[in-house]
């Protein structure tokens, strides 16, 4: 019975991880494509805001449409993990919301820092969600932690590159930051798809028993 339960837990963990791996890879590809097409369109003809909306919606629609079969299979596992947030304490929900929305809301007050605030928003939001799920659901999602850490590490990198290379081209600086976000999700997605999971509580440095 113990062996059967362990196998079930392991299978469930792998399914959820792969589901988020597929989702993160799709997000990564869509972000990079939309960023590049937005910059190309801006350079060639200049763009109004609604053109950006069309490009981004079309990019995500195309990528998610092409990945529909994989995402459809992954959707139940994704929704199941997201449901865990409904059981968090109110304070935890508020904190998580601030981590996600705070940096993006700050763009209105500091538009010149747009490219850094979007990286901070993705980084802090994913980090907060990772910590909350780990604390309240006793689930470790390293792929989400990777997205957070890569995004946050990209902030100083973007500052240095922008000041040294793109000081007079904020449009390119913004595109670079979005590509960093794509890289962050790609890293998390690849980790989720390639990592071999052991059962919950499994420590590979021990004899293999549950802790």
Positions of predicted regions on the chain:
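Alpha-helical transmembrane segments of polytopic membrane proteins
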Residues: 22-26, 51-60, 92, 115-122, ...
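N-terminal topogenic module of multi-pass integral membrane proteins
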Residues: 1-77
């Amino acid at each position: 019975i113990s062996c059967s339960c362990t196998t079930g837990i392991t299978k469930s963990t792998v399914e959820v991880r792969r589901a988020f791996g597929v989702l993160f890879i799709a997000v990564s590809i869509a972000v990079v494509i939309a960023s590049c097409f937005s910059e190309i369109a801006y350079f060639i003809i200049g763009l109004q805001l609604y053109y950006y909306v069309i490009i981004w919606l079309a990019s995500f629609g195309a990528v998610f449409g092409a990945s529909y079969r994989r995402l459809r299979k992954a959707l139940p596992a994704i929704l199941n993990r997201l449901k865990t947030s409904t059981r968090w304490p109110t304070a935890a929900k508020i904190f998580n919301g601030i981590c996600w929305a705070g940096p993006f809301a700050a763009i209105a007050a500091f538009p010149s820092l747009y490219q850094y605030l979007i990286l901070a928003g993705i980084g802090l939001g994913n980090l907060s969600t990772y910590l909350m799920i780990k604390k309240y659901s006793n689930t470790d999602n390293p792929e989400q932690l990777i997205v957070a850490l890569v995004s946050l590490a990209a902030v100083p990198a973007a500052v240095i590159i922008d000041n040294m290379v793109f000081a007079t081209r904020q449009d390119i600086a913004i595109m670079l930051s979005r590509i960093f976000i794509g890289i962050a999700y790609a890293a998390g997605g690849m980790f989720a798809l390639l990592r071999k999971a052991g059962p919950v509580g499994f420590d590979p440095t021990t004899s293999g028993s549950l802790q």
